[in-house]
Amino acid sequence: MKSVEPIRDTKTIKNMRAILKSQSTRNELLFILGINVGLRISDILKLKVKDLTKLNTKAPKDYVIITEIKTRKTKKFYIGDIVKKEIENYMKENDNPGFDTYIFLSRKGINMPITRQQAYRIINNAAESLGIVERNDQGNLIHGEIGTHTLRKTFGYHSFQNGTSLELLMDLFNHSSKTQTLRYIGITEEQKKDVYLKSNLG
């Protein structure tokens, strides 16, 4: 399987969000949370109401501390205003679910989160409806690789474009080199070239 890509265009992000919002607040929050906190999908899907909201008011927390499934390391991430608003919408639309309820609740079983495969289909189908992903009549991919890892890579790509240092992103992603991080967040040679061509100082 080819490596998935970040979503580089902010208009596409808005269009993806609109499609997912039309489906459910769950799907919209999955997307918005994923592109704003940079967690792996395995860590996103295990989140419960008690992880994202305050015990006394059920208002969104300012930050969350989790143990990453892959690394077993403790990770602290902060919740910005856009994500907080989505959490509030989610709580309202879902009649204030209990604290032990999974945020990304499956319709199958009792209090079970959606699977990675379900999350992939949610994101990939939205991308396909926008023409980002195209398949032939046999269902094989023609172009576009969008999946759950796209969310994390989109966070990294736009953080870098907005001035976050490469060293900080390396730390956030637990990478061992700058080259690894640049490749991971989808900074291509063509984009590196643009940096120089757009620099016309003096």
Listing of model-derived features with the role each one plays in the protein:
Residues 1-14, 73-82, 97-98:
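DNA breakage-rejoining catalytic core of tyrosine-based enzymes
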Residues 46-53, 170-176, 185-186:
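A short, basic/aromatic helix-end/turn motif that makes direct DNA contacts
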Residues 10-41:
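Basic, Lys/Arg- and aromatic-enriched nucleic-acid-binding interface segment
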